[in-house]
């Protein structure tokens, strides 16, 4: 459990391991206390639906749902964690945000005739929008802050184990943003005979933003099926 020892030449505690020059292995207690990732996640969901009966067997339903997720991931690697690459400590901070909005409008019709024939039809449309963004910030502490003969700052961190962006000259930032929209119309119908024979027909057409500015901006896919209940 004695995972760190004091280094008088650097005036900090460093990794206590049999071979500090290797990168593959570390003292497990050091990893637990000085290389431990921390993450936080929040998720929110809101939704609702409204249904209206127009007449017997015919109804209209509208639904709306919104979801949002926020996640933060931090990893602070103390000085001497990785041989040759962590002289003063490295800071990694990642933040991810995502949200989704979905809504649809459905018309449903159900009818039975003399317990012999049945018909069930659903038709409608839907809208879906997804959006995600991420920001990753890495402060490399692989070298001491220095200035070359020309007076130009080269790289490095100012002080060891100070995990703040202001402590690092060498910062790496990566930002991503993605957004997608999907609009759809669809219909499905089921014909039944004496509750033993069923024929299903469905069709759907989607318009996706991922296909924008292409020849095939939408795609259509129908289906037909049948089923028989032998005991009927």
Predicted features and spans:
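Amphipathic alpha-helical segments in well-structured domains
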Residues: 217-224
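Exposed, low-structure sequence patches enriched in small/polar residues
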Residues: 182, 188-192, 202
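Surface-exposed loop/interface segments of Gram-negative outer-membrane beta-barrel transport/assembly proteins
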Residues: 1-43, 63-183, 210-212, 219, ...
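Residue-level recognition of beta-strand termini and adjacent short loop/turns
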Residues: 55, 112-114, 194
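Transmembrane beta-strand segments that form the barrel wall of outer-membrane beta-barrel proteins
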Residues: 199-209, 230
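Residues on the lipid-exposed face of transmembrane beta-strands in outer-membrane beta-barrel proteins
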Residues: 48-52, 105-109, 123, 187-193, ...
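Conserved C-lobe terminal segment of protein kinase catalytic domains
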Residues: 69, 194-196, 208
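Repeated loop/turn-to-beta-strand initiation elements of outer-membrane beta-barrel proteins
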Residues: 57-60, 117, 196-199
């Amino acid at each position: 459990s004695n995972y760190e020892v004091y280094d008088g030449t650097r005036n900090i505690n460093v990794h206590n391991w049999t071979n500090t020059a290797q990168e593959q292995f570390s003292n497990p207690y050091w990893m637990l206390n000085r290389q431990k990732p921390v993450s936080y996640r929040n998720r929110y969901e809101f939704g609702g639906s409204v249904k209206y009966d127009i007449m017997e067997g015919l109804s209209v339903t509208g639904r709306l749902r919104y979801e949002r997720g926020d996640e933060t991931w931090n990893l602070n690697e103390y000085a001497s964690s990785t041989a040759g690459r962590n002289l003063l400590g490295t800071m990694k901070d990642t933040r991810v945000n995502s949200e989704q909005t979905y809504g649809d409008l459905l018309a449903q019709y159900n009818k039975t005739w003399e317990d012999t024939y049945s018909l069930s039809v659903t038709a409608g449309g839907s809208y879906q929008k997804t959006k995600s963004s991420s920001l990753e910030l890495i402060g490399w502490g692989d070298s001491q802050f220095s200035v070359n003969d020309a007076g130009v700052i080269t790289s490095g961190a100012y002080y060891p184990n100070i995990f703040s962006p202001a402590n690092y000259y060498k910062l790496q930032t990566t930002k991503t943003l993605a957004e997608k929209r999907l609009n759809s119309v669809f219909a499905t119908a089921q014909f039944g005979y004496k509750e033993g024979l069923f024929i299903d027909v469905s069709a759907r057409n989607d318009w996706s933003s991922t296909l924008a500015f292409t020849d095939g901006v939408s795609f259509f896919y129908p289906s037909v099926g049948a089923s028989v209940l032998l005991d009927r």
